[in-house]
Amino acid sequence: MIFSKLIDRYALYDLHKKRSGEFQYTSLSNTALDIKDIEFFYKVQPSNIHFNIKHAKQEKEYMVGQFKYKSSVQSGDSRNDSVTGELFLHENEDAPHVIFVHGWRMDSNERVKKIFHDHMTNLKWNMYYFTLPYHFERKPNQSLFSGEYMVSANIERTVQATRQAVADLRTLIKWIKANKNGPLILIGISLGGVITNLTALVESAIDVLASIFYANRLSYSIWKTNPGKFIRKDLEHHGVTYNDLIDYWKITEPSQALPKVKKENILLISGKHDLYVHREDTDYLWASWEKPTRYIYTCGHAGIVLKRKKIATDTINFIQNRLNPPHFPNVML
């Protein structure tokens, strides 16, 4: 326990070396944030999506490239409003299609790849690395670091960024389902787990969901955990209380409804000593979702690195078990 917390504390010290140079809070507009209809809020706008696969090259049995498409939720920043990502398409399109969603403030997908990529390449599965709003190449020029604008003291922008993330992810899911064969797997890590869990509330095309070191309530994460302390300071300076934030960000909580994914096809993984994501918050989601399969590791948030072999093994074993007959009788693994 002491070792896990020491590593998390060192990582948090490093995290806070980069922080916003000025307050991000902006006064709320007249637009009400009391949103109840999640189906409407997170809907995918009907459109003829032109899905670009560029810079493609062949690597063994894989076509490797990048994808890019226009977000259906426009923020007004041209960089952020272009959805981007990497893809690794196997010759066998009947193999599972796995979408990965990275964590908050990550600079690349390298941590995610180090957990899963080689294992899934050996399995000959198709892989898509999705980029969250305001991260990587979606980071606006004026932003100081990847992810600065996705979760911040700008209350409405955080809500809209969450909405954009879910809508963008659903667009990719629907494109895969319309153009490829094979089951669809969604894997989220940290903030990516929040987004995949939210997506599961409104998207029925997900066959298996795995959420790793996920949070549940952004309001809790900002107010109660160390990673959010400077955002909380910004909010408190402008008179926002914890109860205010709970109300404003209610629509971003995965625990607000049951997912459309079958309970037996959901895997949740948490760290017992996580200083980024508290057990109280992860327990809340687990109970709200009627207690799907859950693994609790003896580690902190740094388990993303220290426990990556176990994460990969447990997650892939769970997926394979769910894809075996009688769950998916036509799937060839």
Question: What residue ranges belong to the model's regions?
Answer:
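Gly/Ala-rich beta-loop-alpha elbow adjacent to hydrolase catalytic centers
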Residues: I187-G192, T196
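Short beta-strand element of the alpha/beta-hydrolase
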Residues: A95-G103
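Hydrolase active-site cap/lid region
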Residues: N197-Y242, I296
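Catalytic histidine-centered segment of alpha/beta-hydrolase-like enzymes
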Residues: G300-A312
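Conserved alpha/beta-hydrolase "acid-adjacent" motif
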Residues: L275-D281
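N-terminal targeting or regulatory segments adjacent to alpha/beta-hydrolase or S9 domains
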Residues: M1-K68, N330-L333
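Short beta-strand/loop motif that positions the catalytic acidic residue
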Residues: V261-K262, L267-S270, D274
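Cap/lid segment of the alpha/beta-hydrolase catalytic domain
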Residues: R105-N109, K114-R163
